[in-house]
Amino acid sequence: MIDFGPLRRKEKSLQDLAAGLSRDDLGGFTREMCAAQLSALEEAADEDVVMVPDDPEANDTFASQAEDVGLSWTLGHVVVHTTASSEESAALALTLARGLAVEGRSRYEVPWEQARTVAFIRHRIEESLRMRLAMLDAWPDQPDLDNFYTPYAGRPPMNALGRFLGGLAHDDSHLEQMHKIIEQARVRRAAA
């Protein structure tokens, strides 16, 4: 799997990390990431998916309601959030690869309240993998890698490779959170 450490330490941008990568590389990284997410769920039980973890660092600055800003995310919430973000990155990358301008967002997030079982979130990850690989397959044979956009102020410009990689970086940023939630759930189950 790709090392996002230089991005987190602000030593490199997504576009820097994307230099020299191919569409096939992105497909391989996507398979690896989804396999890591599914592996994290191997010992999870349905009750773990809806357990509200202790998360003193919870701070969702994009929450639609003020009371949700400090909400600790359940495992189900994390999975539907991260898959939606990666799918959005894949969709925007497809737009860029086709030589078109990105206008607005391309995001749909399954309501996290629907994520109540391990089977549901496993399916969500598998479905997301299929969707992202399909979007990569839809790239032209010669993608327009000179087509750049800036997602928002303060971010360096990126092309299709950088935009797609951004979704994987986002997935990576939530892997540890998934493991922490599952570990908290395991400890709670053992104590019950």
Pin down the residues of each PLM region.
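Aromatic-glycine hotspot motif
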Residues: 1-76, 80-192
